[in-house]
Amino acid sequence: MSLVVLKLGGSVVTDKDEPETVDEAGLAAAADAVAPLAESRRVVVVHGGGSFGHHHAAEHGVSSESGSHDARGVRAIHDAMKRLNDAVLDALEERGVAALPVHPLSAGAREADGSLSLPLAATETMLDEGFVPVLHGDVISHAGKGATIVSGDDLVVSLASGLGADRVGLCSTVPGVLDADGDVIPEITAFADAADALGGSDSTDVTGGMAAKVRKLLALGAPAHVFGPEGLSAFVAGESPGTVIRGE
C-alpha cells in the first residue's frame, strides 16, 4: 500500500493572530480530507505550530538556530504543541481515523551541525499496524545548544525520505510556490525554475521559508505538492494542485 506524508501548516489549523486558538473550521476541513485518504493509503500527518508553538517559542527566545537550556521554557513550548496535537488527534478520531501521536522531542535529536536524527522504527510499526502517526513541529534536543525548534517541514523531509513516501503534500495558506507576479508555478524540477521569485538564495531564510522548503523538497525521491486549503481535496483524490516539486 502506498505511503503519503501530509503536512497541515499551522496557519491552516490555528488562528495565528490569537495565541493557542484552533481554527475550528480549518481543522475540520483538513480532518474531513484526511479521513478518506487514510482508508486507502498509509498516511503520516505532520502539523505546524501556528499560534500554539510560535507564541511560546518567541516568548522563550527559542528558534531553529537559537537554543535554550531552560527546561521550564522548553516544556512550555512542548506542552503547547501537545495541546494542539491533541486537538488534531481528536478531530481525526471523530472521523474514524486511527490516529496516534509521535512527539519529536522524545523521538529525535539534532547533531551539533544541525542535522536531524529522527529514528522511525516506532512510526513505521504504527503504519504497519494500521495506525496514522501524527507528528508536529516541536522543540528537540540539540547537541551543544540545549533544545531548538524542529519545523514541520524538516520532519516531512525526514519522514518522506526515511519511510520511502510515494507522495508528499504540504498544505498552507498559499496556493503554491508563487512567481514574481504572484502566480502559481505549476512545476519545479530545479531550484533555477523558481530562483527569481525566491530571490535566488535562501541565505536570509532563517525561519525555513519557501526557498529553503523548495531546496529540501527537490532532494526527495517523491513528488511533493505545495498547495492551499482549497487544493487539499484534489491532492487526496490523486490530483496535482498548486505546485509540484519534482527533483530530477
From Swiss-Prot:
ATP binds at K7, L8, G9, G10, S11, G50, G209, K213. The record marks K16 as: Transition state stabilizer. It is an enzyme of class 2 (transferase). It comes from the Archaea. GO terms for molecular function: ATP binding; isopentenyl phosphate kinase activity; kinase activity. Substrate binds at G49, H54, G152. InterPro entries: AceGlu_kinase-like_sf (IPR036393), Asp/Glu/Uridylate_kinase (IPR001048), Fosfomycin_R_FomA-type (IPR024192). GO terms for cellular component: cytosol. NCBIfam families: IPPK_Arch (NF040647). Keywords: ATP-binding, Isoprene biosynthesis, Kinase, Lipid biosynthesis, Lipid metabolism, Nucleotide-binding, Transferase. It catalyses: isopentenyl phosphate + ATP = isopentenyl diphosphate + ADP. The keyword ATP-binding applies. The keyword Protein biosynthesis does not apply. Belongs to the isopentenyl phosphate kinase family. This is Isopentenyl phosphate kinase. Its EC number is 2.7.4.26. Pfam families: AA_kinase. GO terms for biological process: terpenoid biosynthetic process. Catalyzes the phosphorylation of isopentenyl phosphate (IP) to isopentenyl diphosphate (IPP). Functions in an alternate mevalonate (MVA) pathway leading to IPP, a key precursor for the biosynthesis of isoprenoid compounds such as archaeal membrane lipids. Homodimer.
